Design a protein with these regions (language model features):
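ABC-type nucleotide-binding domain
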Residues: 53, 330-581
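Helix-loop-helix
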Residues: 47, 152-166, 175, 180, ...
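A short amphipathic helical element positioned immediately N-terminal to and/or at the very start
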Residues: 1-12, 117
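Transmembrane helix-loop-helix hairpins at lipid-water interfaces of multipass membrane proteins
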Residues: 13-77, 81, 154-159, 261, ...
Length: 581
């Protein structure tokens, strides 16, 4: 994990060294002050005249002021450089994680929940950022203070300083306990944070459903349960601190009492001066306080390791859909699609049932292919294989005779327009959302695409027309309006293959008929796949695939299937009854 994350410090080690140097300067200056104060006591006691006392006090005071200013300078340098290093470290790490996640396939995203990925990119990276800052400041300051204080203590009384060695076994035990119990606790705590984020995310996204079903109290209970779990896990982690702190404080107080007792005996014997006892005690307290800081710091490092492991897990995830070594770049794509004995299941590592079984058909360039079938029969799974959102587990999906797995991914998806089952719009203006399909589209092209998708009229009715902001992904639009904007976004690409996954379900039949008419008029060379619940949506298709339980049960035109396919006839009859009733 450390090796993986250390690359994000590349080019920052110089600043890190400056930060460490500044902290060491601050530590030395801070610990030199008691010695200067002790020199004042000594000079006052041995001074021959009031004038010499005044001179000694002024000179020592100026020396202490100079040390304080030098220490302040070192501290400011450390604060600035450590903040700079930690911010740049987090910026690089977060950027790398985002780029990695943006290349995830649907299967990769399925491995992590959306809430977990959000937590890892925000909370976990921020924790690592704080750990880096802590390492540059506290992790340097604490050992520096402890070592310098020990040197000063030894210079005053080596024999009394030796007693500090008995603290080492106790410190080792404390550190071992922290490493053994702290890391698992923080691992669990980060998972609890994932859960809290998941509940909040689901609640905010589904707020309309929550209010429509009057389930606010239920969602509050869910949040409180998740929050209570996090608080309970946090309390366990805090319990470790509560256990460690009293032990360290008891050790500190016992040693300080012993120092004053032993120092009094040494002063009585003439070995130490009275002023040296207080100075020696201050150094011992510094050493012990820094040992306590080390124990607290290890708790943060344990949490940092838990977060680091979670971040590295994302960075090390093998992306299962990538470009081949020598990707195929089509020069003049036609849009012909062929499925050859294709089978597919989502869980390729398990033994689950296939979602699709032995699918074979051919769609010629420019044909309109309708796909009908019951809920859960695999319609969406089938079309998801064309742009390689998933890969087939068996067989081949070919475009213009070339396996899609041989295509350059960008080139493949550039020639395909997709309107997914779930309408997704982004924050921004209507114009910006349409340009998602073609980033250099002109205003005229945007208007033409919206006219073809029957969206132009309602867009003009918006307060600012095409410059109207879509709040929270289009919550200020109806379902049918969002569908038409998504269709326009796909149409503006003028793709060779257009996939409409139940994309007119919220559109009235008259508007849907106009959209279909625009396909026939403007997309004669585009191969169109239409998944629909209404037979009327695919009735004029060149081919209709009838899916049932992951298998093709019929292929043909509307008339052919109506004549010899029982499943299709049942669908038509059922819908006809619904209309007549």
């Amino acid at each position: 994990m450390l090796k993986k994350l250390s690359k994000y410090m590349k080019g920052l080690w110089g600043l890190a060294a400056i930060s460490a140097a500044g902290m060491i300067v601050e530590a030395i200056c801070e610990l030199a002050l008691p010695s200067l104060a002790n020199s004042i006591y000594q000079k006052v006691g041995t001074a021959a005249s009031p004038e010499s006392v005044r001179t000694a006090v002024i000179l020592s005071g100026l020396g202490m002021l100079a040390l304080a200013l030098l220490g302040l300078f070192g501290g400011v340098v450390t604060m600035k450089t450590s903040a700079n290093v930690s911010q740049r470290f987090a910026y690089r790490l977060r950027g790398d994680m985002y780029r990695k996640i943006s290349h995830f396939s649907f299967k990769n995203i399925d491995q992590f929940s959306t809430a977990s990925l959000t937590t890892r990119m925000t909370n976990d990276v921020t924790t690592l950022q704080n750990v880096v800052m802590m390492c540059l400041r506290i992790l340097v300051r604490v050992p520096a203070l402890a070592v310098v204080a020990a040197c000063f203590a030894v210079s005053i009384n080596p024999k009394m300083s030796a007693m500090l060695l008995i603290l080492l076994p106790i410190l080792i035990v404390v550190v071992a306990c922290i490493l053994k119990f702290g890391f698992p606790m923080f691992q669990k705590m980060q998972k609890k944070i994932d859960n809290v984020n998941r509940v909040v995310q689901e609640n905010l996204i589904g707020m309309r459903v929550v209010k429509a079903y009057v389930r606010e109290d239920r969602e509050k209970d869910k949040f409180h349960d998740a929050s209570d779990d996090l608080a309970a896990q946090g309390a366990k982690a805090a319990g470790l601190i509560v256990t460690v702190m009293p032990v360290m404080m008891l050790m500190l107080n016992a040693v300080v009492v012993f120092v004053y007792y032993k120092g009094a005996l040494e002063a009585n014997a003439g070995v130490m001066e009275v002023g040296q006892i207080s100075v020696f005690a201050s150094y011992v307290i510094q050493i012990l306080m820094n040992l306590m800081m080390i124990s607290m710091m290890l708790l943060q490092l344990a949490r940092g390791k838990a977060c680091g492991d979670r971040v590295v897990e994302v960075l090390d995830t093998e992306i299962d859909i990538t470009n081949p070594q020598n990707p195929y770049l089509p020069e003049n794509p036609k849009g012909g699609v062929e499925f050859r004995d294709v089978s597919f299941k989502y869980n390729t590592e398990g033994h689950g049932d296939d979602i699709l079984e032995h699918i074979s058909f051919t769609a010629k360039p420019g044909q309109i292919i309708g796909i009908v079938g019951g809920t859960g029969c695999g319609k969406s799974s089938l079309v998801n294989l064309i742009p390689r959102l998933y890969d087939a587990t068996q067989g081949q999906v070919l475009i213009d005779g070339v396996d899609v797995r041989k295509y350059d991914l960008t080139a493949l998806r550039e020639m395909i327009g997709v309107v997914l089952q779930k309408n997704v719009l982004f924050s921004g203006t209507i114009k910006e959302n349409i340009r998602w399909g073609k980033k250099d589209a002109t205003d005229e092209e945007i208007v033409a695409a919206c006219q073809a998708a029957q969206a132009h009229d309602f867009v003009l009715a918006q307060p600012k027309g095409y410059d109207t902001d879509l709040s929270q992904g289009g919550l200020n639009l109806s379902g049918g309006q969002k569908q038409r904007l998504c269709i326009a976004r796909a149409m503006i690409k003028h793709p060779k293959i257009l996939i409409l996954d139940d994309s007119t379900s919220a559109v009235d039949t008259a508007t849907e008929a106009k959209i279909r008419e625009s396909f026939y008029k403007n997309f004669k060379d585009t191969t169109v796949f239409i998944i629909a619940q209404r037979v009327s949506s695919v009735q004029a298709a060149d081919q209709i695939l009838v899916l049932d339980d992951g298998q093709i049960k019929g292929i043909g035109t509307h008339e052919q299937l109506l004549a010899d396919n029982e499943i299709y006839k049942e669908i038509v009859t059922t819908q006809a009854k619904g209309v007549s009733e």
